[in-house]
Amino acid sequence: AIVGRPRF
């Protein structure tokens, strides 16, 4: 997961 993006 990348902080600043929705959980994918």
Curated annotation (Swiss-Prot):
Modified residue Phenylalanine amide is at which positions?
Answer: 8
**What one GO molecular function would you report for this record?**
ion channel regulator activity
Q: What positions belong to coiled-coil segments?
A: none
Q: Where is it located?
A: Secreted
Record's GO cellular component terms: extracellular region
Q: How is it modified after translation?
A: The amidation of Phe-8 is essential for rat ASIC3 current potentiation. A synthetic peptide with Phe-8 not amidated does not potentiate ASIC3 current.
- What is this protein's tissue specificity according to the annotation? Expressed by the venom duct.
User: Which keywords describe this protein according to UniProt?
Assistant: Amidation, Ion channel impairing toxin, Proton-gated sodium channel impairing toxin, Secreted, Toxin
State whether keyword Secreted applies. Answer: yes
Chief location category: secreted
Q: What protein family is recorded?
A: Belongs to the NPY family.
Function comment? CNF-Tx1.3: Potentiates ASIC3 (homotrimer) currents and heterotrimer-containing ASIC3. Is less potent than CNF-Tx1.1 and CNF-Tx1.2. In addition, it slows the desensitization kinetics of ASIC3. In vivo, intramuscular injection into mice enhances acid-induced muscle pain.
Q: What is this protein called?
A: Conorfamide Tx1.3
